[in-house]
Amino acid sequence: MKRLIILNTAEISIILPTYNESKNIRGILEHIKKSFPSNLKLETIIVDDNSPDNTAKIAEDYFHSIKEKSSHSINVIKRKAKNGLSSAILNGIQESSANTIVVMDSDFSHPPNIIPKLIDAIKQTRCDIAIASRYVNGGSIQGWPIKRKLMSKVATLIAKKGLGVKPHDPMSGFFAFKKNILDGLKFDALGYKMLLEILVKTKGVKIEEVPYTFTDRELGSSKLDTSTIVDYFKSVWKLYKYGRTVEKDESRASVRFLSKAARFFTVGASGLAINYLASMIFSLNSDMWYIHATTFGIIFSISSNFLLNKYWTFEDRDFSPKRTII
């Protein structure tokens, strides 16, 4: 991976993952530059996956043409292979010098004039994540056929219902966030929806949505293909499993107030109580002989002891059949 490194501490870092964007890259960089005051320390990080159309070279040439008269720096990261959008974004985050980061596409589907609105949302509302949203009041999509819109709606519904995320547009690829909210988190970098993974893995963050009009690209070709769709479902499944694991860990942590020995004793005592109560209930409320009632009481106490020991006393053990069958 080769880089054009510009040493600079920026106020805002903008990450542009690219692949074969030679027709758009210079124009998008010019529009980004025009969207901010000339004295603002702005850093654009281009993460290029070895584009054969010289996208990275065009970006480098553009930077050399403006660096003497602008505080806008451009860092071009050249990767040796096409490793995916999410991993490109993570590369960009690692190389960024600002705490406020913007992620966007370079094909003009994400209008650069919306970037200041995202930054304002973070500064004025003190939110942690500002999402450019197609699905809030004032947002829309232009240039997509009905089939593509339907696919987007279904993907959004799956993310919201399946993963429990709250924003209207969790599938947006255009968003800003405070870099420090990612501290301590590990990412799978699978697929192309980095925002979705951030939403699932960050807790207690404040989110704002900014409406915008998504416009389908005019130049270059779309990156959506079958592998992208497959990666999406893979990432949703992995995030779902991640969420379930976190829920289990939190549930277990909430009852970790007794040692294993104390829990085992407590479960045993509760079994005696359940045995006694069940025996009394069966004998007093039916014509059942006391021996039969006691037998049912024993069955209830054995069952309760088994379940309590499995899910509480030994909650850190895996009792799945493949682990328990010898």
Feature map (PLM): residue ranges:
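Short aromatic/hydrophobic "clamp" motif used to bind/position activated sugar donors
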Residues: 101
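Conserved donor nucleotide-binding strand/loop of the catalytic core
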Residues: 42, 46, 56-95
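Acceptor/aglycone-binding surface of glycosyltransferases and processive sugar-polymer synthases
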Residues: 77-95, 112-192, 217-227
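Cell-envelope/extracellular polymer assembly enzymes that use nucleotide-activated donors
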Residues: 11-13, 43, 197
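Short, acidic, metal-binding catalytic loop of nucleotide-sugar glycosyltransferases
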Residues: 31-41
